[in-house]
């Protein structure tokens, strides 16, 4: 019985449109990513892009925006700064700021593209020329990708409705979809993290600000433990 259900689930997944499947994969990966794994990916991306840009005038530098990862809800507020730097002059030619979803998306794109080229460079002298030709314009190409529209404002369920609510696990939904889901479940539709009530979510107009998050944490603290008496 279990094998039959698993087979049916896989069949459904295989029939999903490519965009939906990719989006679902990125959302799931962002949700389960630990802080240590996140920092490791930032370091890995810097290492990969440095290798690809060897001998070139420009390279990319990824770094976590100071203070943006200090919250318990770092997945929601963390920001990664991507900077394109001229090696010769040291001048910063362009900078972009990414949220976690955008970073994971770019990480997968860059590492998948780089894997083949870097593998060849370890086994063939001819790959050095290939590496040079690929890396010459990659900094500009990848930086350009950051300017393209993303799905960060789309509901994780229908991928159409505007985000109205964000759970502590950083997954976001439109009100219509989450209302239907919460009628029968008390968990996140994506990662299945338990949600005990309305206090476990943000209702947002655009995106949660640091003030929104601070207020949420303060309200949460008010409900924990007992008042401290002198």
From Swiss-Prot:
Pfam families: zf-C3HC4_3. GO terms for biological process: protein autoubiquitination. PROSITE patterns: ZF_RING_1, ZF_RING_2. The gene is RNF141. Gene3D superfamilies: Zinc/RING finger domain, C3HC4 (zinc finger). It comes from Gallus gallus. PANTHER family: RING FINGER PROTEIN 141, RING FINGER PROTEIN 141-RELATED. The lineage of its organism: Eukaryota, Metazoa, Chordata, Craniata, Vertebrata. GO terms for molecular function: ubiquitin-protein transferase activity; zinc ion binding. The keyword Zinc-finger applies. InterPro entries: RING-HC_RNF141, RNF141-like, Znf_RING, Znf_RING/FYVE/PHD, Znf_RING_CS. This is RING finger protein 141. A zinc finger (RING-type) spans 154-191. Keywords: Metal-binding, Zinc, Zinc-finger.
């Amino acid at each position: 019985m279990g094998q039959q259900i698993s087979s049916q689930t896989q069949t459904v997944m295989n029939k999903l449109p490519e965009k939906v499947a990719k989006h679902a994969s990125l959302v799931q990966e962002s949700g389960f990513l630990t802080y240590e794994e996140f920092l490791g990916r930032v370091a890995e991306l810097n290492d990969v892009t440095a290798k690809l840009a060897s001998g070139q005038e420009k390279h990319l530098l990824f770094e976590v925006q100071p203070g943006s990862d200090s919250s318990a809800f770092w997945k929601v507020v963390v920001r990664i700064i991507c900077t394109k730097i001229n090696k010769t002059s040291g001048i910063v030619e362009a900078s972009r700021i990414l949220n976690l979803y955008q970073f994971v998306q770019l990480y997968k794109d860059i590492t998948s593209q780089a894997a083949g080229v870097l593998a060849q460079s370890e086994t063939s002298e001819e790959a050095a020329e290939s590496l040079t030709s690929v890396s010459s314009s990659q900094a500009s190409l990848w930086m350009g990708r950051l300017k393209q529209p993303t799905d960060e404002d789309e509901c994780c369920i229908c991928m159409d409705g505007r985000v109205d609510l964000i759970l502590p696990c950083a997954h976001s939904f439109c009100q219509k979809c989450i209302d239907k889901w919460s009628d029968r479940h008390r968990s996140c539709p994506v990662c299945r993290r338990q949600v005990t009530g309305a206090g476990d979510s943000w209702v947002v107009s655009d995106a949660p600000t640091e003030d929104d998050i601070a207020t949420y944490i303060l309200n949460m603290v008010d409900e924990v433990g007992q008042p401290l008496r002198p």
